[in-house]
Curated annotation (Swiss-Prot):
InterPro entries: PLipase_A2, PLipase_A2_Asp_AS, PLipase_A2_dom, PLipase_A2_dom_sf, PLipase_A2_His_AS. SUPFAM superfamilies: Phospholipase A2, PLA2. The active site is at residues 47, 89. PROSITE patterns: PA2_ASP, PA2_HIS. It is found in: Secreted. Expressed by the venom gland. It is an enzyme of class 3 (hydrolase). The keyword Membrane does not apply. Contains 7 disulfide bonds. This is Basic phospholipase A2 Ceg-N6. It comes from the Eukaryota. Keywords: Calcium, Disulfide bond, Hydrolase, Lipid degradation, Lipid metabolism, Metal-binding, Myotoxin, Secreted, Toxin.
Amino acid sequence: NLLQFNKMIKIMTKKNAVPFYTSYGCYCGWGGRGKPKDATDRCCFEHDCCYEKLTDCSPKTDIYSYSWKSGVIICGEGTPCEKQICECDRVAAVCFGTNLRTYKKRYMFYPDFLCTDPSEKC
């Protein structure tokens, strides 16, 4: 769920999802359109695509199990939905951590109306 995703982001980046990733670029936060602005925004685009594939799941509210050790996140046991949601969140959190050096403050609170490029498909 979103609280667990926030915790994963904190593990991988040492930053809180709010405010750093909730309205970053064109895809971080609710919705998304246009082209991702940078590598961090692409992490959000891919995360949105991952969630879209989970048609019979509730990724924002379903609780899953996971653990971490030395900065490595491991998804635990659970239903197929729980495992897939956890994996979507884990991959995005790792992506944020990988791209931390190229995070740009100018894309924080980025206005949607500037996301005018044609949208990419998943």
